[in-house]
Design a protein with these regions (language model features):
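Internal hydrophobic alpha-helix adjacent to the cofactor/substrate pocket in enzyme cavities
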Residues: 378-399
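A glycine-rich dinucleotide-binding beta-alpha-beta segment and adjacent secondary-structure elements
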Residues: 306-372, 400-413, 531-584, 589
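Core beta-strand elements of the Rossmann-like FAD/NAD(P) dinucleotide-binding domain
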Residues: 136-145
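An anion/pyrophosphate-binding glycine-rich loop and adjacent beta-alpha core
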Residues: 33-35, 180-320, 417-503, 512
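Extended, charge-enriched "interface" segments that sit outside catalytic cores
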Residues: 430, 447-452, 456-608, 612-614
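Beta1/beta-strand and adjacent pyrophosphate-binding region of the FAD-binding site
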Residues: 1-12
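Glycine-/small-residue-rich beta->alpha transition segments that form the dinucleotide
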Residues: 145, 150-154, 314, 327
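Conserved N-terminal/central alpha/beta ligand/cofactor-binding core
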Residues: 18-122, 149-166, 173, 177-178, ...
Length: 615
């Protein structure tokens, strides 16, 4: 018998099985093909706004995605650097082939983990509890817990034009019985849709008609364990390119709108709001004269370019016209045509904050089956599901992150409390406390928590403590370093637009000012540190007031989260509650007053009434 069985070896499944096996649980992962472990069927990249911070959080919790992303990156780019640190995010262009190889090897080397190459027919449920899985050949594998991370493979159809083909992503097979076994147990499913653009042969593109988009020329990384020698040097990194749709492109799309699976009535599932198809963009943003597209390399082993922003479900002949209307792609050869894919997802309102099903005990779900989109969102969920399944086996308290602790916490709270009717994507705007949830401080927020439950090694924890001590010492030294007015200092301040010093002050006081850095003051203080130490001191000092306010605001949330609501509260008979509140509270059954307050349709007077019932 296994402690944990994971169904599906995509980005959620990988982190789930690695988390549970690192916590010394006997784990198995079932995949249709070992060669598809960690595949990237859509964009060949990791990170981006909000999502890049999730990858940093996965690193702080001992996950594998950040390590794999660093070591297989073709380009590193820090985004939003003209804005405040609360929205800085790293994005890497990934080598999708190298990434798959890295992840497959990581799973094969992991202790306490078996890889089973098979199709999973159903989750086996007895007396309301998941007790294992049945494979397509009718083999039963018993397990104390099951984690479903089947991605877009449940009853999936690939759609182009007026044609629907029973298939999973990248011409892989689909499984039609798995979601039925869930529905039979009372779990609600619904249809979602996503899509992917065409891939074209690199050597048939005229890149002189495109704008080069190089990466960031500095050492960047997702994982704190990555060293400079582990990543591709800047001069060897690939360059992406920017182009725009043309009037001819729009004309072709408008002419053939009725041929798109999206608009012909073939698609029943709801598509992603924040990553729409190109035909959807033209309909929704009719006033825009052009849309930007990025030409992105997929792998050093492939001669293909991914056209980011150009997903479509048009027929193949129309796709030929569309692609050839783009600048630089007039004579290109299409290697793989775009498609939309429709699949079954489960209603996340039936999931507890620890990712266990409310309907079937010992069944955990993570990734796109929960209604999310994106590799990073999936990986973050997978890690949490794997950890919580392991904790459930041990009879320990669940591991749940608050909204002020992690973007992963924001995502899971949104899913459990608000649900979703469309593919959910993390955005910085979803986080009320984004100044606390920064790229730079993920380890400070989460690493100790990961260490306490067995996700993070002693070696990694010791390195973290050493780093925190170095930051503390550096702050003290800079606070004690007195800078007196003199001509050199005055000249430095003047070059940055400041008046000369009227009297002496500490280096830390000067660092509060914009543009003044630890390195810039080094010749006056004799103090300089590693780049990440300098960055921490500068962010903590320059944004101290804003960070303090965010922490005060978060305290209110923390107090609300401590106020527990009994699972068996009879909301239907609380006459003072509004009708909508009674219905939604009965369905969602929030665990805390804080969670109840975030349910749409619950008003302050309802919360006041509930506060009297807090146990």
């Amino acid at each position: 018998m296994y402690d944990v069985i994971v169904i599906g070896a995509g980005h959620a499944g990988i982190e789930a099985c690695l988390a549970s096996s690192r916590m010394n649980k006997k784990t198995a992962i079932v995949t249709l093909s070992k060669d598809m472990i960690g595949s990237m069927p859509c964009n060949p990249s990791v990170g981006g706004p909000a999502k890049g911070i999730v990858v940093r959080e996965i690193d702080a919790l001992g996950g594998m995605m950040p390590i794999a992303a660093d070591k297989t990156a073709l380009q590193f780019k820090m985004l939003n650097t003209t804005k405040g640190p609360g929205v800085w995010s790293l994005r890497v262009q990934s080598d999708k082939i190298a990434y798959k190889h890295f992840m497959k090897e990581a799973l094969e080397k992991q202790d306490h983990l078996d890889i089973i190459e098979a199709a999973c027919k159903s989750v086996v449920i007895k007396d309301g509890k998941a007790i294992g899985v049945e494979l397509e050949d009718e083999t039963f594998i018993e397990s104390k817990t099951v984690i479903l991370t089947a991605g877009t493979y449940m009853t999936s159809n690939v759609l182009r034009g007026h044609t629907a083909t029973v298939s999973g992503p990248e011409e892989q097979r689909t499984v039609n019985t798995l979601s039925k076994s869930l529905r039979d147990a009372g779990i609600r499913t619904f249809r979602l849709k996503t899509g992917t653009p065409a891939r074209v042969k690199m050597d048939t593109i005229d890149f002189s008609k495109a704008e080069p988009q190089p990466g960031t020329n500095q050492f960047l990384r997702f994982s704190e364990t990555t060293n400079p020698e582990d990543v591709l040097p800047f001069e060897k990194q690939e360059i992406c390119h920017l182009i725009y749709t043309q009037p001819k492109t729009h004309e072709i799309i408008h002419t053939h709108l009725h041929d798109s699976a999206m608009y012909s009535g073939l698609v029943k599932g709801v598509g992603p709001r924040y990553c729409p198809s190109i035909e959807d963009k033209l309909v929704r943003f009719a006033d825009k004269e052009r849309h930007q597209l990025f030409l992105e390399p997929e792998s050093k082993e492939l001669d293909t370019i991914y056209i980011q922003g150009f997903s479509t479900s048009m027929p193949i002949d129309v796709q030929e016209e569309m692609v050839h209307s783009l600048p630089g792609l007039e004579h290109c050869v299409i290697e793989k045509y775009a498609y939309a894919i429709e699949y079954d997802a489960i209603d996340p309102l039936q999931m507890k904050p620890n990712m266990e099903s409310k309907i079937v005990e010992n069944l955990f779900t993570a990734g796109q089956v929960n209604g999310t989109s994106g590799y990073e969102e999936a990986a973050g969920q997978g890690l949490m599901a794997g950890a919580n399944a392991a904790l459930k086996v041990d009879g320990k308290e669940p591991f749940v992150l608050r909204r002020d602790e992690a973007y992963i916490g924001v995502m899971l709270d949104d899913l459990c409390t608000k649900g979703t009717k469309e593919p959910y994507r993390l955005l910085t705007s979803r986080a009320e406390y984004r100044l606390l949830l920064r790229h730079d401080n993920a380890d400070q927020r989460l690493l100790e928590k990961g260490y306490e439950i067995g996700l993070v090694s002693q070696e990694r924890y010791d390195a973290f403590k050493k780093k925190m001590e170095a930051i503390k010492v550096a702050r003290e030294e800079l606070s004690n370093a007195h800078i007196k007015p003199n001509s050199d200092v005055d000249e430095y301040l003047k070059s940055l637009g400041f008046e000369p010093l009227a009297h002496g002050c500490s280096a830390l006081d000067l660092i509060k000012r914009p543009k003044i850095t630890v390195k810039g003051l080094a010749k006056y203080t004799g103090l300089d540190y590693e780049d990440q130490i300098n960055e921490q001191i500068e962010i903590q000092t320059k944004y101290a007031g804003y960070i303090a306010k965010a922490k005060r605001d978060a305290k209110h949330l923390q107090q609300m989260e401590k106020m527990k609501l009994a699972h068996d509260l009879d909301y239907e008979n609380m006459d003072n509650l509004s009708l909508e509140a009674r219905q939604k509270l009965t369905e969602i059954r929030p665990l805390t007053l804080g969670q109840a307050s975030r349910i749409s349709g619950i008003n302050p007077s309802d919360i006041a009434i509930l506060a009297m019932r807090v146990k």
